[in-house]
A protein has these predicted regions:
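N-terminal glycine-/serine-/threonine-rich phosphate-binding loop
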Residues: 59-64
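Outer-membrane beta-barrel channel domains
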Residues: 1-30, 34-40, 45, 49-55, ...
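Exposed, low-structure sequence patches enriched in small/polar residues
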Residues: 176, 274-609
Length: 609
């Protein structure tokens, strides 16, 4: 028995047509698909091997590297699948967006490596772990025990002697993998998944007393196990699952276990999801936390969500997972109204959400109210409005462990207009205003232009400019500085399909910052307002920053599921003392001193059933 769903994007109308006709706001999906029964089918065992060979030339380190490996896939039945990779190479994967983050909270980057993306659904233990969100409201960072971007990520930090040094570039280079294997399947009402990955040892270049040396660090081993029981008696969906992860390293092991439960009423109007988890970091600290979320479909197009979460200060899932912060108790809520066929407009989505939060010491560490409204006019133009409000609170993170301080009441507002994206030429433009942590102002302007003359070619230009007065950044110990800063963020993206089998893609993203020191502050010894002080002794805190990614990527499908990749990558992450630098000076400084300047050729060919 199968459930059938067909969908087609109608470009000139900017609509998606489907059968059965299911709206994006529907609370049920799989259970309402068109049922089809197919008889006399004998599923065939499937297997495939994808051997590859790659050569890369690193023009920064003047090294040429050869790499040979294979991906493999075996499906002995429709209920079991085994996949793996040996000596993988991910050099041809599309680059991440460029982000300069000087705060204490980590930026989440979605997974783009195909091996880790495929078959990942069983390891998604709650809606909070699903990064494929939609809608006008800002869902925030995910809460997930399995963030595969940790695998083959940056090396672990090293303890160095006073005369030893390692550049930031070396600590940002990815770690190679020896291999990985993944098993997913189902038996009756049980779904399961097993996953393991193994990093190679890594040599990190550095200096000791000015002499070049190599520091060797062993790689980490990763393991994930997932089991979930699902039942849909009387039309209501119930599920209970366990998810366990392990990261093993000579410096210490990190073990995390979570239990999750899910419930959906037969009419799809009430959905409950919950997860509790515990972490054990090398037997030295054990933490606990969890959350419960409720979603209520009040009527067609109207949804109310409520969530409660608690994480103690010892919970740490970030060796393999992603959690923006621990030491937190938070209540959050959202109310979403989606309307269509308004007569004077095609559709509208209204989103009102907010949260209140305190840490385990009882300090009020944050709250916010966000209002978003996306209006699509009958000519397919779109107007987007966002308004935010943040009351006074304590910041216990951005001192990087040096104390807790007060932040001011803040407001922000932004509006954006986008022309119909069904035309050959389309554009968008917006303006925003918000207040800084201590009350300064932040003004931004952004927009873009897209040219799509036919189905084979597209060109996109995006820009963002910001002027900040009062940007608060931690410096060292208990010292903080506010800056007058300007930020310039242009990006270019070009796609050209020579044919259905050949594609050329070029992307350029750059972030440039000019920040001049303004006022100087000291974090109090007990939670309270920052204390304004004279400039501490030492060099100027003013700085410039250039971060860039340029990628030129050619792909030729020489046979089904077999590809030739030719890729050029150039990246920069350059900090410099701010003098009379222009943005062109800052861009040139990063371009001429790249962290990556690599040419890659990779051939991958499929053999199998």
């Amino acid at each position: 028995k199968l459930g059938l769903f067909m969908s087609r994007q109608v470009g000139y109308l900017d609509e998606r047509w489907s059968w059965p006709g299911l709206l994006s706001s529907e609370s049920k999906f799989l259970s309402v698909l068109q049922p089809i029964e197919v008889r006399g089918v004998s599923p065939k065992k499937q297997y495939a091997f994808f051997p590859f060979s790659a050569i890369s030339r690193n023009r920064v380190d003047h090294e040429t590297r050869y790499r040979v490996g294979t991906d493999f896939f075996w499906r002995p039945s429709s209920n079991l699948q085994l996949s793996g990779t040996v000596n993988p190479d991910f050099g041809s994967v599309e680059s991440d967006d460029v982000v300069i983050n000087l705060s204490a909270t980590e930026t989440f980057f979605p997974e783009k490596r195909l091996f880790f993306v495929e078959g990942q659904e069983v390891f998604v233990a709650s809606p909070r772990a699903d990064t494929r969100g939609s809608g006008v409201g800002n869902r925030g960072a995910p809460y997930t025990m399995v963030n595969t971007r940790r695998i083959g990520g940056k090396p672990r930090s090293l303890s160095l002697a006073a005369d030893e040094n390692i550049t930031d570039r070396e600590l940002d280079l990815p770690v190679d993998l020896m291999g990985a294997v993944k098993v997913t399947g189902q038996t009756g009402r049980l779904r399961y998944g097993l996953f393991s990955a193994f990093e190679e040892d890594v040599d990190i270049r550095g200096t000791k007393a000015g002499t070049p040396v190599k520091f060797t660090q062993t790689g980490s081993d990763y393991g994930v196990a997932r089991l979930i029981y699902e039942d849909s008696k009387a039309g209501a969906y119930r599920a209970f699952g366990i998810l366990s992860t392990a990261v093993l390293h000579e410096s210490g092991d990190a073990l995390v276990t979570g239990l999750d439960g899910h419930y959906l009423t037969s009419d799809g109007k009430i959905q409950l999801d919950a997860q509790v988890m515990t972490s054990d970091i090398d037997g030295q600290s054990r933490g606990y936390g969890g959350f419960i979320d409720g979603e209520f479909a009040i009527k067609k197009g109207v949804v109310q969500r409520v969530g409660i979460e608690y994480f103690d200060r010892d919970l740490d899932i970030n060796d393999l997972g992603f959690l923006e912060r621990n030491d937190s108790f938070r209540i959050r809520s959202s109310h979403i109204r989606t309307s269509s066929g308004l007569g004077w407009a095609k559709s509208n989505q209204f989103d009102l959400r907010g949260y209140v939060q305190e840490n385990n010491d009882g300090l009020f560490t944050g709250a916010a109210v966000f209002l978003s409204d996306s209006l699509t006019l009958n000519n397919l133009s779109n107007v987007l409005l966002r308004v935010g409000f943040f009351p006074k609170a304590f910041d216990d993170l951005n001192s990087f462990g040096n104390g807790t301080y007060r932040t001011a009441l803040r407001r922000d507002v932004a509006i954006r207009f986008s022309s119909p994206n069904t035309n050959k030429w389309s554009f968008g433009s917006g303006i925003g205003w918000r207040e800084e942590m201590l009350g300064g102002r932040h003004i931004s302007v952004g927009g873009g232009l897209t040219w799509r003359p036919n189905d084979r070619f597209s060109f996109r230009l995006r820009y963002f400019w910001a002027d900040r007065d009062g940007w608060l950044i931690h410096q060292e110990a208990r010292n903080m500085t506010t800056f007058k800063a300007q930020q310039w963020v242009p990006s270019l993206n070009m796609d050209y399909f020579f044919s259905a089998k050949q594609q050329l893609k070029a992307t350029l993203q750059w972030v440039g910052i000019k920040a001049a020191e303004d006022e100087f502050w000291e974090i109090p010894s007990s939670p309270g307002a920052l204390v304004k002080v004279a400039k501490p002794a030492g060099p100027s805190d003013s700085f410039g920053k250039s971060q860039m990614t340029f990628q030129l990527r050619y792909r030729w499908e020489i046979a089904p599921l077999s590809d030739l990749f030719i890729v050029y990558i150039r990246g920069a992450d350059k900090g410099l003392g701010l003098q009379d630098n222009s943005f062109s000076d800052i861009f040139q400084a990063g371009w001429e001193d790249p962290t990556a300047d690599t040419f890659i050729v990779k051939l991958r060919y499929r053999f199998g059933s």
